[in-house]
From Swiss-Prot:
SUPFAM superfamilies: Protein kinase-like (PK-like). It is an enzyme of class 2 (transferase). PANTHER family: CELL DIVISION PROTEIN KINASE. Belongs to the protein kinase superfamily. Ser/Thr protein kinase family. It catalyses: L-seryl-[protein] + ATP = O-phospho-L-seryl-[protein] + ADP + H(+); L-threonyl-[protein] + ATP = O-phospho-L-threonyl-[protein] + ADP + H(+). It comes from Acanthamoeba polyphaga mimivirus (APMV). Disulfide bonds: none annotated. The active site is at 133 (proton acceptor). This is Putative serine/threonine-protein kinase L232. The keyword Metal-binding does not apply.
Length: 633
């Protein structure tokens, strides 16, 4: 570097890396003696897209998970300018940590890194940009803090590109590899890469790393999932490709020639990487990875949806007391927002299908089950089994799996052949509870056989729970709304109300559809409404609007007016200890649905539960009033 404004202030210590658009040095500030990273690039008449993006990043970004740019120095020459971008110096990149240093990250560290990457990408997304080059070398680490760097390939997500810059091949989605940007969604490029990055953090190996398209496509199919024929057509893949790969994975053997099968066998022998045992494991982390590496751009998550999928990893992590808990400061006040009719109506369209199903689990109200609500451990297992059963029954009703999963857990009884499918399903739930009762009666030192003589002997509750999951090929949701309540700083004087309301809520199979945090907030809203007369009146008003919204069909029957989404805001003192600033429209609708569940429960079952949970008559009368409101025609 020549003598200029840069050398007057900094001394080069070491060369860190060199790329197409610049060189990165480790430098020392002469006056303060502090070390920084410096990226040097030259701009002449051919001012490049990548150079311009680096300058945008300096002006637009300010986030703890994006590399901080402290200063930009410019040395003006005769026919060119040399830029020196002074940045914070990091300890290294993920590539160095995972492959050079061969560090294996434990689960808590992986999840911590993952949520930091999501935070950084979501911040860029909120500013209108996608990174577009999220490789291992561009994710830096400083004191265990993720720093996303190198913004040269980023795009404005609101602008459809005719041509996308090619980045590192293993992080490119199929639509870019195939050279068809017209089906590319800028919002989904980073999330494909995010799935790849998280795979490397989990297994210390790169999932896809081929130099040609044919091997790359086969690798995607053999290690993750098979694309639909529609997707293959959109990518203009050859007929030979469709015949060889698509049909094999769809098991349409009759359509295959022996030559095609031999060709695939030769590929297996030559690469020895046809399958991937890591992704065959049914874990929450693998589910996250596979969802992000979806061939279909439409079904691939964007960064907002990635955050929700991250929380599903936490929700399904076992056991609960090892799950990372995101702490927040409890605000001194809570805002209750009154939403306009148009906002409630438009949001209600997302929930409309739930109100068409009036299924309840009858066994949930039987005496032998109601006995187990007194202790948190017993109550927790009951509601978790209910949530698991909800997942199963929804799986039974889905158009792809209708009743196919019944053979996993149905057992014969005297009326088995005479029963309907739903009756068989509910009769089988009795067995779930009897399995759970083993823990109730013998925990923590029980010795029993599960599923009679042909199953294994268990010695502790965690082993029981593991095999319970394994037998059913499902996951028990462990971080549910009640767990969130227990782990929060909410005033525990409201615990009995919360337990009671949540017990009512999980009697519906649809309980598994709702976000656990929203359910927690909605039940707390119902409790706050019981204690605060002003909130009660406002909540009733919102429910009345929702009554009307359920009766109005989509778009044509409603007068679209350009009114505000929020028409009023009321602040109350946060004497409840809830870690929330305000209630969202989803919280209002979920509270409405919880009261809808109460409405479906017969008076007989309702009264039995009231006695078991020792709920005072005043609270019951309050719920009756809410039920009467949503029962209006």
């Amino acid at each position: 570097m020549s003598n200029n404004i840069f050398t007057n202030n900094y001394t080069i210590v070491d060369k860190l890396s060199e790329g197409t658009y610049g060189i990165v040095y480790k430098v020392e500030h002469i006056e303060s003696k502090k070390n920084f990273a410096c990226k040097k690039f030259v701009i002449d008449n051919n001012f490049t897209y990548c150079n311009y993006n680096e300058l945008i990043a300096h002006n637009e970004f300010n986030h703890s998970n994006l590399i901080e740019i402290y200063d930009i120095l410019v040395d003006y020459g005769h026919d060119k300018c040399t830029y020196y971008v002074i940045m914070e110096l990091c300890d290294g990149c993920l590539f160095d940590i995972l492959f050079c240093d061969k560090v294996f990250l434990d689960e808590s560290q992986r999840l911590d890194y993952l949520i930091q990457i999501i935070d950084g990408l979501e911040y860029m997304w909120s500013k209108g940009f996608v990174h577009n080059d999220l490789s291992l070398t561009n994710i830096l680490v400083k004191n265990n803090k993720i720093k996303i760097a190198d913004f040269g390939f980023m795009y404005n997500r609101f602008i459809k590109q005719d041509i996308y810059h090619r980045n590192t091949i293993y992080i490119q989605p199929p639509e870019l590899i195939s050279g068809h940007p017209r089906i590319c969604d800028p919002n989904k490029i980073d999330t494909w890469a995010l799935g790849q990055i998280f795979y490397v953090m989990c297994y210390n190996s790169v999932l896809y790393n081929y130099s040609n398209k044919t091997d790359y496509y086969l690798d995607i199919i053999s290690k993750t999932n098979t694309p639909s024929l529609d997707i293959i057509d959109k990518l203009y893949l050859s007929d030979k490709y469709k015949k060889l790969y698509y049909n094999i994975f769809r098991k349409n053997i009759k359509k295959l020639t022996q030559n095609a099968i031999n060709e695939l066998v030769c590929y297996n022998k030559s690469t020895n990487k046809f399958s991937n045992d890591n992704l065959r494991k049914k874990t929450s982390s693998n589910k996250f990875i596979k969802k992000h590496m979806n061939w279909s751009v439409r079904h691939r998550p964007d960064i907002k949806q990635s955050r929700k999928l991250f929380y599903e990893i936490l929700a399904n992590k076992y056991p609960i007391y090892n799950s990372p808990i995101i702490q927040s400061i409890i605000p001194s006040t809570i805002s209750f927002r009154e939403f306009s009719f148009h906002k409630l109506w438009s949001s209600m369209n997302n929930y409309d299908y739930l109100f068409k199903s009036n299924l309840l689990f009858g066994i949930h109200f039987e005496y032998k089950i109601r006995l187990h609500h007194r202790f948190d451990y017993q109550y927790n297992l009951i509601v978790k089994i209910m949530l698991l059963m909800g997942k199963i029954i929804r799986s039974c009703f889905s158009k792809y799996n209708k009743f196919k999963c019944l053979n996993k857990f149905i057992y014969p009884n005297n009326n088995y052949l005479l029963s309907s499918q739903i009756s068989r399903l509910e009769n089988s739930f009795d067995r779930f509870y009897s399995m759970g009762k083993i823990i109730y009666c013998h925990y923590p030192f029980f010795e029993n056989y599960i599923f009679d003589y042909d199953t294994i002997k268990l010695s502790n509750s965690l082993e029981f729970q593991y095999h319970f999951i394994d037998i059913l090929d499902k996951e028990i949701p462990c971080l549910d709304a009640y767990d969130i309540f227990l782990l929060s700083n909410c005033n525990k004087m409201y615990q009995k109300y919360f337990k009671y309301m949540y017990y009512l809520f999980v009697s519906s199979p649809n309980a598994t559809v709702f976000d656990n945090n929203i359910v927690y907030q909605s039940i707390m809203l119902i409790i706050i409404s019981y204690k605060n007369s002003l909130i009660y009146k406002k909540l009733i008003n919102q429910f009345l609007k929702l009554n009307i919204s359920t009766k109005i069909k989509y778009s044509r029957e409603i007068n679209h007016c350009f009114n505000d989404d929020i028409i009023n805001v009321i602040e109350i003192d946060n004497d409840y200890g809830i870690n929330l600033n305000y209630f969202t429209v989803d919280t209002i609708i979920t509270a409405y649905y919880i009261i809808h569940i109460c409405r479906l429960i017969t008076n007989e079952k309702y009264n039995l539960l009231n006695i078991n949970f020792a709920i005072e008559s005043k609270f019951i009368k309050y719920l009756d009033k809410l039920v009467s409101v949503i029962d209006m025609e």
